[in-house]
Amino acid sequence: MTVEWLAEQLKEHNIELTETQKQQFQTYYCLLVEWNEKMNLTSITDEHDVYLKHFYDSIAPSFYFDFNQPISICDVGAGAGFPSIPLKIMFPQLKVTIVDSLNKRIQFLNHLASELQLQDVSFIHDRAETFGKGVYRESYDVVTARAVARLSVLSELCLPLVKKGGQFVALKSSKGEEELEEAKFAISVLGGNVTETHTYELPEDAGERQMFIIDKKRQTPKKYPRKPGTPNKTPLLEK
């Protein structure tokens, strides 16, 4: 009854799961576990844990940010599709692009999107650093990333993709506050401004989460993002 558990949790936030959405989440779980046996998509495979720590965790940002509008989203380093695919299931009008550096994960996502019959999704095999220099630079309403690197690094990978007036939605676990302090210099250099922070608990004491909404106020200087690997090795920090 795990999908029913998810439905109950979302109902507390006035979100109703349709039968189609329930079926999509069940299919998502089955495909995730099946493909995980041949490639490393996630260390979390217990059914309830997937619903709690992947599906619910991916949808939770919608409690604080209005995804129920026709916006374009780019998800950087989404791995097995988190948070953007659960958000797409919940809000079908979203236009979703996922950028991931591992081609095997892109193959999984293509198969998943086909099985879930998702429209307006595209999956691109690229490094965020090179993707942020190309034609998609400053073209997305929202760019999201879920804890793939420290916030100072994530900002350099994500803010160049956000259009002026758009938002970077960063999802972190409990140590986000100290990362935010460290990242403020990079965020400013890259044209961003932190406008909202939200701290919330996952159900069943599964951990604290933090969400930062960063508005793109100015264009990102052309030299960012720097070449692949550099943001991680030498993050933009105040001297």
From Swiss-Prot:
Keywords, comma-separated and alphabetical: Cytoplasm, Methyltransferase, rRNA processing, S-adenosyl-L-methionine, Transferase
Localization terms from the record: Cytoplasm
GO cellular component: cytosol
Pfam families the record matches: GidB
Protein residues bound to S-adenosyl-L-methionine: G77, F82, A128, E129, R146
Region (Disordered): 215-239
GO molecular function: rRNA (guanine-N7-)-methyltransferase activity
Top-level taxon of the source organism: Bacteria
Class of this enzyme: transferase
InterPro entries registered for this protein in UniProt: rRNA_ssu_MeTfrase_G (IPR003682), SAM-dependent_MTases_sf (IPR029063)
Biological role stated in the UniProt entry: Specifically methylates the N7 position of guanine in position 535 of 16S rRNA.
Family note: Belongs to the methyltransferase superfamily. RNA methyltransferase RsmG family.
Protein name (Swiss-Prot/TrEMBL): Ribosomal RNA small subunit methyltransferase G
